[in-house]
Amino acid sequence: MKKLLIHFFVLLTVMFSKNLTLESRFNPPARELMDVEIIGDIMIIPGNLDGYDFFDISDPTNPVHISNIEVPMGNRALSGFWVKAKDSVAYFSSRTRGEGSAIVNFNDPSDPVHIGSLSLDGAGVNNPSLEGLDILENMLAVAAHEDGVFIFDIDDSYNPDLNYMFECGNAWDVAFIDSNHIAIGNGEYGLILLEISCSIEPCSQTTIETEGAVKDVEYRDSSLYVAEGSAGIALYDISDLESPILLDQYDTEGLANKIALFGGNKVAVSDWEDVKILEWTGTELELVGYKKTGKRTMAIAARDSFIYSAEWQHLQTFRFGDINDADMDISSWDIAFPALEMGTSDTFELLIENNGQYPLGLIAPSLTHNDFYVVDFPEYMEPAESTAAKVSYTKSNQNASGIMQISTNDPDEPHIFVQLVGNYEGGIIGIDAPEFSLPIVANGTGTFTLSDHLGQIVVIAFFAPG
């Protein structure tokens, strides 16, 4: 039998004294959760599908779902990508062009009411796609990709008045620095620090080139934290707006999409497949905690030591702090094997860690398909110990997919279920694709034919109704 080995090494340079403990997991009515806003004891989470959810977090360990509101848009609910709230009014933005916002009164969180939407009459824009939001006093700032940034006066919270516009390349997010300055996350074009009102034109403007495309910006006490997608997290000192200083850049290894600040010098990161906690030590950003969720972490919020992870289908609540018990982390919740010849094998190294302060006891994993097997699986791990178990797959004439259940004495996650995917009938990474032609419905015209693009790297997005 020919055996192929692929080694995956994950190097950790930090021995955690603190980490993330799972407090609760909830599957809310809204799907594809995109943002989290906390105002008092109310938490608001918009979904790309099926509306916006309201939670009571007076018990921070256990969010209680209060209500869901769907804002009508044709035959579905208006999607929500960002939300900001003031008093009892929430403002939602959406990438849906033409109907891209909603204003909701949640004075009674059990019965939120759709009031209206942001008016862009007179702005001279055509069907903008709205993204990040921020509120300071009576001002609401809205990022709008290629249409730049809009600022509204929200003294009349139900009828915001557009009073400022700034054009830029690809505004993903915006944050108030003070009442006269904003920071714009300008996507692949970097950052803009902008004066929005001045006695002598032009107002001051500082542009910063970033390592990655900016997805989220958060400001606190002269520090600007920036989520840059695949480039991780950057931290700038912007006490002098005309001469910002890059303090550090941390590669999170995932896709840093949204961030939340807490504890004075810490930042929680939604990093696609995991949640990471970074701490500014005064000299560098240091990884001080993480939890691999395996559930597409899309957005994040933090209050005190509690971290709320909004994911594709779940809301998970974590507590950041000392873990006196055993605490297991694994490097992947999904293991997929490439195309193989009949009878050949492939092996994936699964990193297992005990990030708690008590020994971790493990039971040999159970597997639901006999084409998969595990070797070098530990039975016992000391605190701060890590090891690699080998998960192998041998191709047979069966369609191969299954579940590996790992059971331990980790009290918050006693059972973890890892998805295993071998070879099956259909498209598999590593096999030749059949010739096809499809009509191009966005970002171009005509027909896409596979043979016209041989030797090229091509990304194709397929969309279906929700």
What is each stretch, according to the model?
Residues 448-466:
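Short active-site neighborhood of thiol/selenol oxidoreductases, capturing the structured segment around
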